[in-house]
Design a protein with these regions (language model features):
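Histidine-rich, glycine-flanked metal-binding segment
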Residues: 29, 43-102
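Active-site-adjacent C-terminal substructures of enzyme catalytic domains
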Residues: 275-276, 285-403, 415-421, 427-429, ...
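Metal-associated gating/positioning segment near the N- to mid-region
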Residues: 91-159
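Divalent metal-coordination and catalytic microenvironments
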Residues: 39, 68, 73, 98, ...
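Metal-coordinating catalytic core of metallo-dependent amide/deamination hydrolases
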Residues: 139-161, 165-166, 173-286
Length: 443
Protein backbone atom coordinates (compact mmCIF):
# COMPACT_ATOMS: atom_id res chain seq x y z
CA UNK A 1 0.00 0.00 0.00
CA UNK A 2 1.09 3.53 -0.70
CA UNK A 3 1.06 6.08 2.06
CA UNK A 4 -0.06 9.62 1.32
CA UNK A 5 2.55 12.31 1.71
CA UNK A 6 2.70 13.95 5.11
CA UNK A 7 0.51 16.97 5.84
CA UNK A 8 1.80 20.25 7.34
CA UNK A 9 2.38 20.39 11.08
CA UNK A 10 -0.30 21.31 13.58
CA UNK A 11 -1.39 24.91 13.95
CA UNK A 12 1.33 26.21 11.61
CA UNK A 13 -0.31 29.59 11.01
CA UNK A 14 -3.66 31.27 11.38
CA UNK A 15 -6.44 29.70 9.33
CA UNK A 16 -6.44 32.91 7.34
CA UNK A 17 -2.73 32.68 6.58
CA UNK A 18 -1.21 31.46 3.33
CA UNK A 19 0.78 28.48 4.53
CA UNK A 20 -1.88 26.00 3.35
CA UNK A 21 -3.12 26.79 -0.13
CA UNK A 22 -6.69 25.83 -1.00
CA UNK A 23 -6.77 23.66 -4.11
CA UNK A 24 -9.61 23.08 -6.55
CA UNK A 25 -10.50 19.45 -7.22
CA UNK A 26 -9.20 19.77 -10.78
CA UNK A 27 -5.79 20.66 -9.37
CA UNK A 28 -5.59 17.52 -7.30
CA UNK A 29 -4.68 14.17 -8.84
CA UNK A 30 -7.71 11.91 -8.93
CA UNK A 31 -7.55 9.25 -6.25
CA UNK A 32 -9.36 6.13 -7.37
CA UNK A 33 -9.26 4.60 -3.91
CA UNK A 34 -8.46 6.03 -0.48
CA UNK A 35 -8.27 4.31 2.86
CA UNK A 36 -8.54 6.57 5.88
CA UNK A 37 -7.27 4.66 8.90
CA UNK A 38 -6.74 4.90 12.65
CA UNK A 39 -8.89 7.93 13.44
CA UNK A 40 -8.94 8.52 17.17
CA UNK A 41 -12.65 9.19 16.68
CA UNK A 42 -14.46 8.67 13.40
CA UNK A 43 -17.63 10.65 14.06
CA UNK A 44 -19.97 8.97 11.58
CA UNK A 45 -23.35 10.39 12.70
CA UNK A 46 -24.91 7.24 11.27
CA UNK A 47 -28.57 7.03 12.16
CA UNK A 48 -32.10 7.74 10.93
CA UNK A 49 -32.48 8.90 7.33
CA UNK A 50 -33.91 12.23 8.49
CA UNK A 51 -33.03 15.18 10.66
CA UNK A 52 -32.30 14.21 14.26
CA UNK A 53 -34.49 15.24 17.19
CA UNK A 54 -34.45 14.87 20.96
CA UNK A 55 -31.91 12.35 22.26
CA UNK A 56 -30.89 11.51 18.68
CA UNK A 57 -28.97 14.80 18.60
CA UNK A 58 -26.51 13.28 21.08
CA UNK A 59 -26.01 10.00 19.22
CA UNK A 60 -22.86 10.49 17.14
CA UNK A 61 -22.11 6.84 16.29
CA UNK A 62 -18.39 7.28 16.96
CA UNK A 63 -15.95 4.57 15.87
CA UNK A 64 -12.65 4.58 17.76
CA UNK A 65 -9.67 3.58 15.63
CA UNK A 66 -12.11 4.13 12.79
CA UNK A 67 -11.56 4.00 9.08
CA UNK A 68 -13.22 4.53 5.71
CA UNK A 69 -12.69 3.09 2.25
CA UNK A 70 -13.37 5.70 -0.41
CA UNK A 71 -13.69 4.98 -4.10
CA UNK A 72 -14.35 7.57 -6.82
CA UNK A 73 -15.34 10.17 -4.26
CA UNK A 74 -17.93 7.97 -2.55
CA UNK A 75 -17.69 6.29 0.85
CA UNK A 76 -17.65 2.55 0.11
CA UNK A 77 -17.34 1.26 3.66
CA UNK A 78 -16.97 2.51 7.23
CA UNK A 79 -15.73 0.59 10.24
CA UNK A 80 -12.77 -0.41 12.37
CA UNK A 81 -9.43 0.31 10.75
CA UNK A 82 -8.41 -3.35 10.88
CA UNK A 83 -11.40 -4.34 8.77
CA UNK A 84 -11.02 -1.44 6.34
CA UNK A 85 -7.34 -2.18 5.81
CA UNK A 86 -8.10 -5.75 4.64
CA UNK A 87 -9.81 -4.34 1.55
CA UNK A 88 -7.35 -1.53 0.88
CA UNK A 89 -4.50 -3.27 -0.92
CA UNK A 90 -4.30 -0.74 -3.74
CA UNK A 91 -5.48 2.25 -1.75
CA UNK A 92 -3.63 5.40 -0.88
CA UNK A 93 -3.53 5.65 2.90
CA UNK A 94 -4.64 8.67 4.91
CA UNK A 95 -3.23 8.19 8.40
CA UNK A 96 -5.64 9.90 10.81
CA UNK A 97 -3.94 8.61 13.93
CA UNK A 98 -4.56 10.82 17.02
CA UNK A 99 -7.07 12.90 15.09
CA UNK A 100 -10.84 13.35 14.86
CA UNK A 101 -12.56 12.82 11.51
CA UNK A 102 -16.06 14.01 10.78
CA UNK A 103 -18.31 15.12 7.96
CA UNK A 104 -17.53 18.52 6.52
CA UNK A 105 -19.61 21.15 8.27
CA UNK A 106 -22.82 22.19 6.52
CA UNK A 107 -23.45 25.91 7.07
CA UNK A 108 -27.16 26.46 6.52
CA UNK A 109 -27.29 30.26 6.79
CA UNK A 110 -24.81 32.72 5.27
CA UNK A 111 -24.71 36.02 3.40
CA UNK A 112 -21.45 35.33 1.58
CA UNK A 113 -21.61 37.67 -1.41
CA UNK A 114 -21.18 41.37 -0.69
CA UNK A 115 -18.70 44.17 -1.28
CA UNK A 116 -16.52 45.80 1.35
CA UNK A 117 -16.91 45.53 5.11
CA UNK A 118 -18.72 47.19 8.01
CA UNK A 119 -15.79 48.27 10.14
CA UNK A 120 -17.45 51.60 10.92
CA UNK A 121 -20.54 49.80 12.22
CA UNK A 122 -18.32 47.57 14.34
CA UNK A 123 -16.64 50.55 15.96
CA UNK A 124 -19.97 52.30 16.57
CA UNK A 125 -21.33 49.20 18.29
CA UNK A 126 -18.23 49.15 20.46
CA UNK A 127 -19.20 52.66 21.56
CA UNK A 128 -22.67 51.49 22.56
CA UNK A 129 -24.90 52.15 19.56
CA UNK A 130 -27.54 49.53 18.74
CA UNK A 131 -28.03 47.69 15.45
CA UNK A 132 -31.22 49.68 14.84
CA UNK A 133 -29.57 53.03 15.68
CA UNK A 134 -26.74 52.33 13.25
CA UNK A 135 -29.19 51.34 10.50
CA UNK A 136 -31.26 54.50 11.06
CA UNK A 137 -28.11 56.59 10.64
CA UNK A 138 -27.30 55.09 7.24
CA UNK A 139 -25.21 52.14 8.33
CA UNK A 140 -26.27 48.54 8.56
CA UNK A 141 -27.57 46.64 5.57
CA UNK A 142 -27.96 49.77 3.46
CA UNK A 143 -24.26 50.67 3.58
CA UNK A 144 -23.39 47.22 2.23
CA UNK A 145 -26.09 47.51 -0.44
CA UNK A 146 -24.50 50.68 -1.79
CA UNK A 147 -21.06 49.06 -2.01
CA UNK A 148 -22.44 45.89 -3.57
CA UNK A 149 -24.44 47.75 -6.19
CA UNK A 150 -21.31 49.67 -7.18
CA UNK A 151 -19.12 46.57 -7.43
CA UNK A 152 -18.41 44.95 -10.77
CA UNK A 153 -19.21 41.27 -11.15
CA UNK A 154 -15.55 40.31 -11.32
CA UNK A 155 -14.71 42.20 -8.12
CA UNK A 156 -17.70 40.78 -6.27
CA UNK A 157 -16.66 37.28 -7.29
CA UNK A 158 -13.05 37.82 -6.21
CA UNK A 159 -14.13 38.97 -2.75
CA UNK A 160 -16.58 36.08 -2.39
CA UNK A 161 -14.02 33.51 -3.52
CA UNK A 162 -11.57 34.72 -0.89
CA UNK A 163 -14.23 34.28 1.78
CA UNK A 164 -15.13 30.84 0.42
CA UNK A 165 -11.54 29.82 1.13
CA UNK A 166 -12.05 30.87 4.75
CA UNK A 167 -15.00 28.49 5.06
CA UNK A 168 -13.00 25.63 3.59
CA UNK A 169 -10.15 26.26 6.02
CA UNK A 170 -12.68 26.03 8.85
CA UNK A 171 -13.77 22.56 7.74
CA UNK A 172 -16.99 23.59 5.97
CA UNK A 173 -17.76 21.88 2.67
CA UNK A 174 -21.38 22.93 1.99
CA UNK A 175 -22.68 26.50 2.35
CA UNK A 176 -26.15 27.97 1.92
CA UNK A 177 -25.61 31.43 0.41
CA UNK A 178 -28.17 34.22 0.16
CA UNK A 179 -28.49 37.25 -2.05
CA UNK A 180 -29.91 40.37 -0.43
CA UNK A 181 -27.35 43.14 -0.80
CA UNK A 182 -28.54 44.30 -4.24
CA UNK A 183 -32.23 45.13 -3.77
CA UNK A 184 -32.73 45.87 -7.47
CA UNK A 185 -33.63 43.28 -10.07
CA UNK A 186 -30.24 43.33 -11.78
CA UNK A 187 -28.16 43.56 -8.61
CA UNK A 188 -29.96 40.64 -6.97
CA UNK A 189 -29.41 38.59 -10.13
CA UNK A 190 -25.76 39.68 -10.13
CA UNK A 191 -25.26 38.27 -6.64
CA UNK A 192 -26.99 34.99 -7.45
CA UNK A 193 -24.88 34.59 -10.59
CA UNK A 194 -21.76 35.05 -8.47
CA UNK A 195 -22.99 32.24 -6.21
CA UNK A 196 -23.53 30.05 -9.27
CA UNK A 197 -19.99 30.78 -10.43
CA UNK A 198 -18.60 29.93 -6.99
CA UNK A 199 -20.11 26.48 -7.45
CA UNK A 200 -18.02 25.92 -10.56
CA UNK A 201 -14.76 27.50 -9.38
CA UNK A 202 -14.42 26.43 -5.73
CA UNK A 203 -14.57 23.01 -4.05
CA UNK A 204 -17.48 24.04 -1.81
CA UNK A 205 -21.06 23.30 -2.79
CA UNK A 206 -23.09 26.49 -2.48
CA UNK A 207 -26.86 26.24 -2.10
CA UNK A 208 -28.40 29.50 -3.39
CA UNK A 209 -31.22 31.38 -1.68
CA UNK A 210 -32.96 34.49 -3.01
CA UNK A 211 -33.26 37.22 -0.35
CA UNK A 212 -34.51 40.19 -2.32
CA UNK A 213 -36.69 41.01 0.68
CA UNK A 214 -33.74 41.71 2.97
CA UNK A 215 -34.64 45.36 3.52
CA UNK A 216 -36.70 48.12 1.93
CA UNK A 217 -34.22 50.07 -0.24
CA UNK A 218 -33.89 53.81 0.26
CA UNK A 219 -35.60 54.64 -3.02
CA UNK A 220 -38.75 52.81 -1.84
CA UNK A 221 -38.83 54.05 1.77
CA UNK A 222 -41.96 56.11 1.17
CA UNK A 223 -43.64 53.35 -0.86
CA UNK A 224 -42.70 49.95 0.60
CA UNK A 225 -45.64 48.19 -1.07
CA UNK A 226 -44.18 49.11 -4.44
CA UNK A 227 -40.99 47.30 -3.49
CA UNK A 228 -42.99 44.27 -2.34
CA UNK A 229 -44.65 44.28 -5.77
CA UNK A 230 -41.24 44.55 -7.46
CA UNK A 231 -39.99 41.49 -5.59
CA UNK A 232 -43.11 39.49 -6.45
CA UNK A 233 -43.64 40.49 -10.07
CA UNK A 234 -40.12 41.20 -11.37
CA UNK A 235 -37.44 39.66 -9.17
CA UNK A 236 -38.97 36.27 -8.38
CA UNK A 237 -39.91 35.41 -12.00
CA UNK A 238 -36.38 36.23 -13.21
CA UNK A 239 -34.76 34.21 -10.42
CA UNK A 240 -36.91 31.20 -11.25
CA UNK A 241 -36.48 31.61 -15.00
CA UNK A 242 -32.68 31.52 -14.68
CA UNK A 243 -32.81 28.77 -12.02
CA UNK A 244 -30.64 30.88 -9.73
CA UNK A 245 -32.09 29.85 -6.36
CA UNK A 246 -33.57 26.86 -4.58
CA UNK A 247 -35.28 28.86 -1.83
CA UNK A 248 -36.70 32.29 -1.06
CA UNK A 249 -35.95 34.04 2.23
CA UNK A 250 -37.25 37.23 3.85
CA UNK A 251 -36.33 39.43 6.82
CA UNK A 252 -39.63 39.45 8.72
CA UNK A 253 -38.98 42.07 11.38
CA UNK A 254 -40.03 45.49 12.64
CA UNK A 255 -38.67 48.14 10.27
CA UNK A 256 -38.13 45.63 7.47
CA UNK A 257 -41.02 43.42 6.25
CA UNK A 258 -44.11 42.94 8.36
CA UNK A 259 -46.17 39.77 8.62
CA UNK A 260 -48.54 40.59 5.76
CA UNK A 261 -45.77 41.72 3.40
CA UNK A 262 -43.82 38.58 4.25
CA UNK A 263 -46.87 36.40 3.61
CA UNK A 264 -47.40 37.98 0.17
CA UNK A 265 -43.81 37.50 -0.97
CA UNK A 266 -43.39 33.98 0.36
CA UNK A 267 -46.74 32.82 -1.00
CA UNK A 268 -45.69 34.05 -4.45
CA UNK A 269 -42.32 32.31 -4.12
CA UNK A 270 -43.96 29.05 -3.07
CA UNK A 271 -46.29 29.16 -6.09
CA UNK A 272 -43.20 29.45 -8.30
CA UNK A 273 -41.73 26.29 -6.78
CA UNK A 274 -39.20 27.77 -4.37
CA UNK A 275 -38.73 26.40 -0.88
CA UNK A 276 -39.09 28.88 1.97
CA UNK A 277 -36.60 30.02 4.58
CA UNK A 278 -37.22 32.97 6.91
CA UNK A 279 -35.37 35.43 9.16
CA UNK A 280 -37.81 35.76 12.08
CA UNK A 281 -38.10 37.05 15.64
CA UNK A 282 -34.53 38.33 15.79
CA UNK A 283 -35.15 41.76 17.28
CA UNK A 284 -38.79 41.48 18.36
CA UNK A 285 -41.36 38.73 18.75
CA UNK A 286 -43.19 39.64 15.56
CA UNK A 287 -44.97 36.33 15.12
CA UNK A 288 -42.57 35.26 12.41
CA UNK A 289 -42.14 31.72 13.73
CA UNK A 290 -45.91 31.22 13.55
CA UNK A 291 -45.93 32.54 9.98
CA UNK A 292 -43.16 30.12 9.05
CA UNK A 293 -45.34 27.31 10.38
CA UNK A 294 -48.42 28.60 8.56
CA UNK A 295 -46.61 28.73 5.22
CA UNK A 296 -44.77 25.43 5.64
CA UNK A 297 -41.31 26.98 5.55
CA UNK A 298 -38.33 24.64 5.60
CA UNK A 299 -36.57 26.74 8.22
CA UNK A 300 -37.14 29.66 10.56
CA UNK A 301 -33.86 31.38 11.38
CA UNK A 302 -32.62 33.53 14.31
CA UNK A 303 -35.55 33.09 16.75
CA UNK A 304 -33.96 35.06 19.60
CA UNK A 305 -37.37 36.45 20.63
CA UNK A 306 -39.56 33.45 19.80
CA UNK A 307 -41.95 32.39 22.56
CA UNK A 308 -43.49 29.05 23.56
CA UNK A 309 -46.33 29.47 21.07
CA UNK A 310 -43.85 29.98 18.24
CA UNK A 311 -41.90 26.88 19.28
CA UNK A 312 -45.10 24.83 19.40
CA UNK A 313 -46.18 26.08 15.98
CA UNK A 314 -42.84 25.14 14.42
CA UNK A 315 -43.01 21.70 15.98
CA UNK A 316 -46.52 21.09 14.64
CA UNK A 317 -45.53 22.16 11.13
CA UNK A 318 -42.12 20.44 11.01
CA UNK A 319 -40.17 23.70 10.60
CA UNK A 320 -36.46 23.38 11.39
CA UNK A 321 -35.06 26.19 13.59
CA UNK A 322 -31.71 27.61 12.49
CA UNK A 323 -30.00 29.18 15.49
CA UNK A 324 -27.33 31.81 14.90
CA UNK A 325 -25.44 32.51 18.13
CA UNK A 326 -22.63 34.27 16.27
CA UNK A 327 -24.87 37.22 15.47
CA UNK A 328 -26.03 37.51 19.08
CA UNK A 329 -22.40 37.52 20.21
CA UNK A 330 -21.22 40.00 17.57
CA UNK A 331 -24.05 42.42 18.31
CA UNK A 332 -23.14 42.41 21.99
CA UNK A 333 -26.50 40.98 23.01
CA UNK A 334 -27.19 38.39 25.67
CA UNK A 335 -30.54 37.22 24.27
CA UNK A 336 -29.70 33.85 22.73
CA UNK A 337 -32.35 31.57 21.21
CA UNK A 338 -34.03 29.07 23.51
CA UNK A 339 -32.17 26.07 22.15
CA UNK A 340 -32.85 23.76 25.08
CA UNK A 341 -36.59 24.35 24.94
CA UNK A 342 -36.59 23.72 21.20
CA UNK A 343 -34.65 20.47 21.56
CA UNK A 344 -36.87 19.33 24.41
CA UNK A 345 -39.92 20.14 22.27
CA UNK A 346 -38.66 17.78 19.57
CA UNK A 347 -37.43 20.28 16.99
CA UNK A 348 -34.62 19.31 14.58
CA UNK A 349 -32.33 22.17 15.61
CA UNK A 350 -29.61 23.56 13.34
CA UNK A 351 -26.76 25.92 14.18
CA UNK A 352 -25.08 28.07 11.52
CA UNK A 353 -22.68 31.02 11.28
CA UNK A 354 -24.96 33.70 9.76
CA UNK A 355 -21.75 34.90 8.09
CA UNK A 356 -22.30 38.51 7.02
CA UNK A 357 -20.39 41.80 7.21
CA UNK A 358 -22.56 43.50 9.81
CA UNK A 359 -23.70 41.18 12.55
CA UNK A 360 -21.71 37.95 12.28
CA UNK A 361 -18.42 38.29 10.42
CA UNK A 362 -17.19 34.74 11.07
CA UNK A 363 -16.96 31.65 8.85
CA UNK A 364 -15.95 29.49 11.81
CA UNK A 365 -18.38 26.72 12.65
CA UNK A 366 -16.10 25.75 15.54
CA UNK A 367 -16.74 29.17 17.08
CA UNK A 368 -20.47 28.60 16.63
CA UNK A 369 -20.16 25.22 18.38
CA UNK A 370 -18.48 26.92 21.31
CA UNK A 371 -21.22 29.56 21.55
CA UNK A 372 -23.91 26.89 21.24
CA UNK A 373 -22.43 25.08 24.22
CA UNK A 374 -21.56 28.02 26.45
CA UNK A 375 -24.44 30.37 25.68
CA UNK A 376 -27.32 28.11 24.59
CA UNK A 377 -26.44 25.12 26.81
CA UNK A 378 -26.36 22.61 23.99
CA UNK A 379 -24.03 19.68 24.51
CA UNK A 380 -21.02 19.37 22.17
CA UNK A 381 -22.69 16.35 20.56
CA UNK A 382 -25.95 18.21 19.97
CA UNK A 383 -24.10 21.15 18.45
CA UNK A 384 -22.13 18.87 16.15
CA UNK A 385 -25.28 17.13 14.89
CA UNK A 386 -26.93 20.52 14.40
CA UNK A 387 -24.06 21.73 12.22
CA UNK A 388 -23.83 18.66 9.98
CA UNK A 389 -26.62 16.15 9.34
CA UNK A 390 -29.50 18.36 10.51
CA UNK A 391 -28.25 21.23 8.39
CA UNK A 392 -27.86 18.90 5.42
CA UNK A 393 -31.49 17.79 5.67
CA UNK A 394 -32.67 21.42 5.72
CA UNK A 395 -30.94 21.84 2.35
CA UNK A 396 -32.50 18.60 0.99
CA UNK A 397 -29.06 17.02 0.90
CA UNK A 398 -29.25 14.70 3.88
CA UNK A 399 -29.10 11.62 1.66
CA UNK A 400 -25.67 12.51 0.30
CA UNK A 401 -23.81 14.66 2.88
CA UNK A 402 -23.78 15.48 6.59
CA UNK A 403 -22.62 12.10 7.90
CA UNK A 404 -19.98 9.49 7.10
CA UNK A 405 -22.01 6.55 5.84
CA UNK A 406 -21.76 4.07 2.99
CA UNK A 407 -22.92 5.58 -0.29
CA UNK A 408 -22.49 9.21 0.75
CA UNK A 409 -20.07 11.72 -0.73
CA UNK A 410 -16.61 11.63 0.82
CA UNK A 411 -16.81 15.20 2.14
CA UNK A 412 -14.95 15.24 5.44
CA UNK A 413 -12.50 17.13 7.60
CA UNK A 414 -9.66 15.89 9.77
CA UNK A 415 -8.99 17.81 12.98
CA UNK A 416 -5.88 18.10 15.13
CA UNK A 417 -7.53 16.80 18.27
CA UNK A 418 -8.36 13.40 19.74
CA UNK A 419 -11.86 14.11 21.10
CA UNK A 420 -14.65 15.85 19.16
CA UNK A 421 -15.50 17.96 22.21
CA UNK A 422 -12.22 19.81 21.75
CA UNK A 423 -13.70 21.56 18.70
CA UNK A 424 -15.99 23.58 20.97
CA UNK A 425 -13.66 23.62 23.97
CA UNK A 426 -10.54 25.17 22.37
CA UNK A 427 -12.32 28.20 20.91
CA UNK A 428 -10.21 30.39 18.66
CA UNK A 429 -7.71 27.60 17.98
CA UNK A 430 -7.34 26.55 14.31
CA UNK A 431 -7.70 22.77 14.58
CA UNK A 432 -8.46 21.87 10.95
CA UNK A 433 -5.74 19.57 9.68
CA UNK A 434 -7.09 18.82 6.20
CA UNK A 435 -10.32 18.88 4.21
CA UNK A 436 -11.57 16.50 1.51
CA UNK A 437 -14.37 17.04 -0.99
CA UNK A 438 -15.54 14.10 -3.13
CA UNK A 439 -12.54 12.22 -1.81
CA UNK A 440 -10.03 14.81 -2.98
CA UNK A 441 -7.89 16.83 -0.66
CA UNK A 442 -8.71 20.51 -1.15
CA UNK A 443 -6.99 21.94 1.94
Amino acid sequence: MQRASSIPARFALSIFGRSNRVLLPAQVAKLKTLALLHASQLVTLAGPKRARVGKELSELAIIRDGGMLIRDGIIESVGLSGEIEKNARDAEIIDARDRVVLSGFVDAHTHLVFAGDRLDDFERRAKGESYEQIAAAGGGIWSTVEKTRAAKDVDLFAQAKRRADWFLKCGTTTVEAKSGYGLTVEDELKILRVIRRLNTETPIEFVPTFLGAHAIPEEFRSAPEQYVALVIHEMLPRVVEEQLAESCDIFCERGYFDIEQSRKILTAAKKLGLKLRMHVDQLTNSGGAKLAAELGATTADHLEKTDEQGIAAMKAAGVQPVLLPGSVYALGSTCYPRAREMIDAGLAVIVATDFNPGSSPTPSMAMVLSLACTQMKMSPAEALTASTINAAHSLTRGEKIGSLETGKLANFAIFDCEDYRELAYWFGVPQVHSVYVHGKRVF
